[in-house]
Amino acid sequence: MFRVCIVILCIVLILYIHPPVTEPMSMRSTDFNQHLNDHGYYIDTDAMSIYDKHDTLIKHYPTLSFNSNESSRIAINKPLTNTILLDHNIPTPTHDIITTQNKNTFKHAKSYFPCVLKPVDGQQGKDVYTHIDSQRQFDLILNQMFKTHDAIMLENLVEGNNYRIFIFNDTILDVIERETPYVIGNGTSTLQELIRHKNNELVSNKRYPVKTMDLSCLQRQGYTLSSIVSPNEKVFITNTINYHNGANPKRIPVHTVDRDNKDMFLKAHRLLGLECSGIDYMSPDITLPYYKNKGHIIEINSKPDTEIHMKAENRPNVFFQTLIQTF
């Protein structure tokens, strides 16, 4: 029974002091304001506008977060966003919504396996469970999620690399690959010791530790927390590939992204009426067109965090310098 639980439960095991979370992209963002000022621009938050040093209006936005309330409402509604994308032939996972009212009569889970469960109103990858491939695992995770959420989104699992595409002023500014957290064995340390050491390093470098670790992820690779990992052996330690869960940000040059992919990202951005967005995209290779390697848009965020772009390669100025060039 203990072994079964190890396979099917995704358990939060490691607790560390969390680095401070930066503000989402908005006119009140300290970093954004500082870089604008450095380049001769300033923001009038009352007018929700950006001006140059000669007081010439550069651009007016509907809200301080750049996006209209309506477009933000659509983007926050994950099922609605998915439906809009599918209606316009943009690849995104098929989905169902499970609520406290229909959970006992919902009988279609098997048709989605392997699947993903995530809260309809979630953010930053919190409470997202992937690689669910059995009814028992599905039921246990679903019941756990209903303790804190009223509606759960069920999706087909999409495999591949995890990318964040940042769009502002109708321009793709930055593309980041979020690399899955892993450890490298040394032949003497247990997997749990290696994970603890990795998290200590992440925190000392002012990065987010791996807080959510999936034991089922370890089991699929043939490991437990007490396993001694062979020298130079790589072990992935979580299915939650998110910057706030220890993922490493790797900048992908925008010019290397396939043109059809870029057109698709901009189309999705415009369909929701957004001025600023962060698109989450899964694909084996973003330099190849989505229709050749089953690339899918997983989510569109109307208030994207800029921290991942600033931390990539420890070059925070690159992102904002590119952003300012859009004015």
Question: Where are the regions that the model predicts?
Answer:
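A long amphipathic alpha-helix within ATP-dependent nucleotide-binding catalytic cores
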Residues: 196-287
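C-terminal active-site "lid" helix and adjoining low-complexity regulatory extension at the edge
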Residues: 243, 249-256, 270-276, 283-327
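Generic non-transmembrane alpha-helical segments
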Residues: 35, 39, 84, 88, ...
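ATP-binding N-terminal substructure of ATP-dependent carboxylate-amine bond-forming enzymes
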Residues: 2-74, 80
